[in-house]
């Protein structure tokens, strides 16, 4: 069991249960506390109820897309590092997500090693 995310709460949102489970397991094995949701409204609830240290957010979600979640967080002035994860290779979507506050944009299928390394880097940047 790793510990690079001990004392960190990671919110993970994806509508694919297999992806959600694998990402959650990867963060837990590195010591994180995790909260999960399968849609955009669930993502907003997770963030509002307990301010996670980091949000891993799928773009294409039922009941409010990942982009709409980012817009809502921006409207509510809720700031936290967000990693957008998507199968959408469109450059405009990437630029839009980054413009709405996503700090990283990773394409599916995402390497769990790359995801964890990106999360670690963002959290270190947020702490300094």
Predicted feature residues:
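Active-site beta3 strand of CheY-like receiver
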Residues: 50-56, 61
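Alpha4 helix (beta4-alpha4-beta5 surface) of REC/receiver domains from two-component response regulators
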Residues: 68, 89-104, 117
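A Lys-centered signature of the CheY-like receiver
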Residues: 108
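Two-component/phosphorelay signaling modules centered on CheY-like receiver
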Residues: 17-35
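Acidic catalytic/metal-coordinating carboxylates
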Residues: 39-42, 65-68
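Non-catalytic signal-transmission and effector/linker regions of two-component phosphorelay proteins
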Residues: 1-11, 113-128
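The feature encodes the CheY-like receiver
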Residues: 20, 62, 90
